[in-house]
């Protein structure tokens, strides 16, 4: 077959394509021109697509084989070559002969946009009219998903029953693990005349995206600014706390540049970096951040670390600006867990006490030993603090502009664990079976040895939900 015959074999004329679209045939239109050209005018139901090696590796294998795929471009030879490649992968593909110039009917002018994790969280907080379609397989979805989403696997997205589930007048967001299947779902929906956005980077990006909330407290005549930095998807919370231009950072995660940016924006100098304990659910960035900022690295003296740091003991007091931090050894979640009390009013409780529950004692496989210790820590060290003490935990979720914290007196009223006898507390804790965080033993080893400084590698290990707390029942 010569080159001209191949072109003819791989092409479809505009009239035939129009007829098929009018008959609502199962067609996916990929406009592979530049984004500017696409947005200046494109065939209705078409999607902007990039044809490159990454697309061929990550997107093409997931395209439905029961749909006709039509490529739209102004270069017939390039389009024919791409169609031949797609056919070799088992896809039913053609290109529009003579490109967009052959289309005699009305064009649409819309922008091709996807949505970032930060923007999606902002819209969820504002309770905008969203329809979140998670296109992963059911077992992936059940493991971890955005609460407001529903599961429609990619193989079912274009089916009539699935299409009927999509409400009208909603902003539709497709979601998958890394943003590849969700792109395909977006293309399939476009073929049915339904506009959707794909979550950029999928649940991976949802895991690592940041948001922060800042509040200044006046305590004993001192101004103390607390910036709560939150991982949107995982719920990890860390803190940048400043006084008189000096700042401390507690429980930093990768990428640690976020804390550097916060300090720079406020003209603060980071002087101390802390971890409340040896984390099991995320890779600590404390060592890397301390090295980057030239700060003192404070780690629990009751846990083993195989790198240089300042061992931090119970009852020590540290000065940051004109505020005083008091160290409290609070074992139970881990044997070496620490909490930090600032000016006797603000408590950074790590994974020991949350606003809706308590830390889990089983991540070192010593739950029977640690559970009664956790009870004693809570009742003899934390609940003896002033009832007006404001608790800032290391995990939780809240609206974008709010800080998640609670006064001790309020926690006592709403967390049943805090009102139980020791016997009932231990029995309830030990009877609560929960899955462990992803790769938790690998993460513990990394945090013990400090043998990672690559945020990308760290984030790959951490994908998944918060599993360090036991909610009150």
Predicted regions and their residues:
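Active-site neighborhood of phospho(di)ester-bond hydrolases with catalytic His/Asp-centered motifs
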Residues: 73, 176, 249-252, 271-279, ...
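Active-site HxH/HxHxD metal-binding segment of metal-dependent hydrolases
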Residues: 187, 234-235, 247, 254-328
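Active-site environment of divalent metal-dependent phosphoester hydrolases
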Residues: 140, 181, 256-257, 278-284, ...
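Rhodanese-like catalytic fold shared by cysteine-dependent sulfurtransferases
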Residues: 1-27, 35-131, 137-171, 177-239, ...
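Short, well-ordered beta-to-alpha junction loops that form the rim of enzyme active sites
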Residues: 31-33, 135-136, 177, 393-397, ...
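Core dinuclear metal-dependent hydrolase active-site scaffold
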Residues: 14, 117-118, 225-229, 238-242, ...
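Accessory terminal helices/loops
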Residues: 2-3, 187-188, 192, 211-216, ...
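Conserved beta-strand hairpin/beta-sheet module of binuclear metal-dependent hydrolase folds
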Residues: 216-266, 340-350, 356
